[in-house]
Every structure is written in C-alpha cells, then in structure tokens.
C-alpha cells in the first residue's frame, strides 16, 4: 500500500515539473519574439553595417543633431564634434579661462589655411617660422663668412699713436654687456628649442635632449626679464647719440666706405649703427620683450587665452629671428670684423687713429 502511494506521488511530481519547464520555455520564446519598445531618441540599430549608404541623402541630414544622427547612423558623432569644433562653450567647474572650450573656433592666420586656431598656429610655426627663420639665419651666416673670406678684418689705414680716447664709459659698457649676455642666453636657448630636434636630438638621444631643453627653457624664462630691464637701460643710455643727423644719408649712400675702402665721416655712431639701434634694439627689441613677457604671463591685468598666447608666440618668434639676423652682423663687426672695435667695448678706450678714421 505504501509502495503504491509513493509511486503515484513521484508520477505526479514528474508531470508537474515537465509542465512547468514547458511553460517557461514557451514564455521565453514569446518574449524574444515580441518587438522591443524603443524609447524616443534612442538608437534603433546598433549594427552600423546595416546603415544604407545613401543615409546622407535624407532631407535635413546636414542639420541633424547628434541624437537624430544616431537613429540613421549609429556611432556617427559628427554633429557633436562639429559643434565642439565651432568653438561651442560647454560647462566646466574649472575656473581657468576657456575651460569650457575643448577646441578653438576656426581662424586663418597669415600663411595658414582656415582651420581651428590651434592647428592654424601649428601650421604657421612649422611651415613658415621654422623654415624661413632657419633660411634667413643661414643666409646671414654664409654672407658674413664670404665677406670675411674676401675682406678679412678691416684694418686701420694709419699707424696707432698710442694716445687713447674714451669711447664708452663704465656704465655704458656695463649696460651693453648685461644686455648682450642676456641676449646670447635667449638666442642660444631659443634656437635649441626651435631647431634642436633637427640637429641635436639625433645626436644626444631623447632623454639627454629633453633634459637639455628643460634647462635651456628655464634659463630662457629667467634671462627674459633681465634682457627686458637691460634693454630699457640701453635704449635710454644711447638714444641721444643715435638720433638722425645730416651726414647719415651720405654715409648710407656710400655704404659706409665698406667696399670702397675710404672712410665716411660720422658722429659718435654711424648710420649703420643707428639703423641697428632703431630697428634691432628699439623696434624688434621691444616687440620681443613685450611678447615674451606676455608668454611668461608677467603682464598684469591680461586674460591669457589660447588665441592670445598663439599670436604672441608667432610675433615673438618672427621678431626674434629678425633680431638675431641683424645682431649677427653687429657681433661680427664688433669682434673680428673690424680692428679695435672689440677693444673699445671691452676697455672703453680706442686709439686716436681709430677715432679719426671711423668717427671724425
């Protein structure tokens, strides 16, 4: 009796289990077959391969928002990036200027195509300032070398008398050498930062070159303010004797006697030195100083945005290249290019014969 009851109970349980499993499978199949309810604005198809190739021909395709584009081309976020690239300002908790702008708006700097400002700055630097600046400096160096090869150091025509005349005071020489040392520091460090990857990086390797450029960049930033202060001192010290005079035109017309071999009368500074003072020291010097102080963020009250820094860098680099080209000639004439010139700035005195021949 008990055995028959147990067999009957097991049969009932087995039938119930089979019925439950059959119902669950049926419900699962029905659920998978039922169409999914798509929320408004959501992606209707995740398979980008199923997108028709003519989706861009739909009316209003170009004006679609990112949500609308996701319906016809899942994964195509062009509308969002188009807004970002147009200079759209988003939200950021950072207090810095332009923190909400991921990409700058399109501009067209001289020498660059119309594109985002960051890319336009890169184009100007890499395709204009670097190659043309290098060509300018190379041309000047080659011209100086050829001139020295043909002319050598310009000698005195008469014998020295031994009588010395003061040409520069101690203060004038101190101002000059302070400015000159700061300028050379800036020029060398600037040239390495601009061109070093072309001729130093392959030799030194990435690690040593990176360490060197870091040191030179630090030296550049510290020498900049020193150059700015000493430049103002130099301008105020020598401006009086660099004012234009009547004999300057005659000096320029005869090329300073550089090719004829005959000296041309001039005041304390000849027309060539005055051109260097007004063009190289005053105009280019102040441009380099102003843009450099802005790049170092040392000018109070300014909003240091990316566009401001980009324009300042381009102006700074271009003016510095021109300034270095001019001062290469000045350094040459003040050292090996003319007999007695370096001694004048080192000791402050020149021989009487030198004074008569060069500055009557």
At which residue positions do the language-model features occur?
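Membrane-embedded alpha-helical bundles that constitute the cytochrome b-like, heme-associated redox core
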Residues: 2-5, 20-360
């Amino acid at each position: 009796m008990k055995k028959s009851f147990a067999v009957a109970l097991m049969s009932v349980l087995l039938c119930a289990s089979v019925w439950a499993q059959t119902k669950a499978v049926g419900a699962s199949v029905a659920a998978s077959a039922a169409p999914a309810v798509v929320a408004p604005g959501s992606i209707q198809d995740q398979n980008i391969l199923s997108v028709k190739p003519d989706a861009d021909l739909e009316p209003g395709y170009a004006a679609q928002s990112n949500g609308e584009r996701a319906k016809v081309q899942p994964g195509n976020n062009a509308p969002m990036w188009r807004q970002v690239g147009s200079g759209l300002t988003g939200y950021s908790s950072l207090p810095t200027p332009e923190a909400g702008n991921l990409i700058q708006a399109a501009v067209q700097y001289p020498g660059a195509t119309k594109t985002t400002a960051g890319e336009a700055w890169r184009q100007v630097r890499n395709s204009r300032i670097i190659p043309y600046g290098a060509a300018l400096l190379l041309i000047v160096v080659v011209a100086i070398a050829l001139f020295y090869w043909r002319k050598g150091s310009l000698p005195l025509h008469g014998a020295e008398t031994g009588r010395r005349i003061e040409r520069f005071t101690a203060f004038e020489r101190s101002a000059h050498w302070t400015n000159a040392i700061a300028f050379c520091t800036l020029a060398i460090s600037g040239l390495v930062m601009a061109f070093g990857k072309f001729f130093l990086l392959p030799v030194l390797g990435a690690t040593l070159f990176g360490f060197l450029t870091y040191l030179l960049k630090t030296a550049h930033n510290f020498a900049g303010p020193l150059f700015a202060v000493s430049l103002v001192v130099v301008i105020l010290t020598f401006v009086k004797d660099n004012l234009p005079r009547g004999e300057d035109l005659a000096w320029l017309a005869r090329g300073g006697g550089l090719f004829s071999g005959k000296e041309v009368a001039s005041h304390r500074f000849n027309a060539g030195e005055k051109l260097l003072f007004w063009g190289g020291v005053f105009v280019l010097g102040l441009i380099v100083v102003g843009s450099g102080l802005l790049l170092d963020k040392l000018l109070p009250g300014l909003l240091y945005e990316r566009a401001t820094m980009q324009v300042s860098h381009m102006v700074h680099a271009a003016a510095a290249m021109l300034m270095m080209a001019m001062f290469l000639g000045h350094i040459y004439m003040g050292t090996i290019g003319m007999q007695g010139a370096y001694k004048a700035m080192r000791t402050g005195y020149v021989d009487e014969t030198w004074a008569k021949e060069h500055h009557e």
